[in-house]
Amino acid sequence: MRVRLTQIDGKLPNVALMKLAHHHRGDEVHFSKHVERDMLEPEYDRVYGSAIFEFSADRVARFRAAFPHAIVGGTFDRANPVTVEAVLNIEDSEAWDYSIYPGFDASIGFTQRGCRLKCGFCVVPKKEGKPRSVNTIASIWRGDPWPRHIHLLDNDFFGQPREQWKARIGEIKDGKFKVCWNQGVNIRTIDKDAAEALASVGCWDDGFKTRRLYTAWDNLGDEERFFSGVRLLEAAGIHPRNLLVYMLVGYDRRETWERIFYRFEKMTALEIRPYPMIFGNRERTLPLGGCNRRIAHRTLSEFQRWVIRKAYTFIPFEHYDVNAKGRADCSQLALAV
């Protein structure tokens, strides 16, 4: 059987596709990140595509047009997320094949599944249910000669029973693992023990080079709980400058530029690094609210780019040129205004 596995979006290796690669061992498996058929591509007996993000709808549509009989799954469709287990009619599987990602040398997996919270924009509670422990660090690591670098995809690490997360922390320390908490820890529910546990093992970016802890501040109403968590982490030894905070924008119907900049400026004042995550139409603007910036024409995608590129450190958003390639270009624009 000739099979095409297609990663439609996402930076990290796609776990669903690695599960399919494991299932199709012995078949002729082709992996691609191209959503359209190449000129010399063969015909396939089966085509799969996996997409994570809702904003990938255009790429999903192009993929389906190129491969009309493809099986497409993933969380991009929040109303009806399709899982590998449903497609293959199997129970939840933790077996996957890394061979489709030959340049990836870390290990990736979950110590727990599910989430205690029920955020309206998130598919995890519907898809995975209540928190439960599923793996040890040792079972996630691929073993020698692979580096002791772990990408943890847990959505609610501290939501599993306390004795379980403490055991995982012990494994990380004893095994001298470097861990990237890719999905973020829930800073709203963090306590002193959890903060100290994180500080004791260190937290790393996805390249395992820089100290970084991922978390989120999605709702303005969570301000007090968010900063309570920030203070607990700082007291434990994790400075705010080491936090990268996912910042949901465009979800709340009351969203305005004033509300967005309130969260943004509260974080940057503490050297926290925000990372906007856009809900819905990326090219729309918002009401100003009480914001006195001249940004009524700016879009959410432009704001996201301005923040991710850290252009806010040297040029106001209203003067930001989204086509500028680097700091020099932006600085020249600022001088010309």
Residue ranges and their predicted role:
Residues 47, 59-60, 79-86, 120, ...:
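Short, charged, surface-exposed secondary-structure boundary motifs
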Residues 5-10, 46-52, 123-229, 240-250, ...:
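Core AdoMet radical
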Residues 69-98:
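Ser/Thr/Gly-rich flexible loops in soluble cytosolic domains mediating phosphotransfer, phosphorylation
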Residues 204-212, 221-337:
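A structural motif corresponding to the C-terminal lobe/cap of the Radical SAM core domain
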Residues 15-19, 102-141:
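Canonical Radical SAM [4Fe-4S] cluster-binding loop centered on the CxxxCxxC motif
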Residues 60-67, 169-170, 195-202, 226-234, ...:
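Generic structural signal for well-ordered alpha-helices
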Residues 1-69, 76-79:
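A short, structured N-terminal alpha-helical element that caps or precedes a catalytic domain
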Residues 1-4, 105, 118, 149:
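Residues that mark the start of a beta-strand
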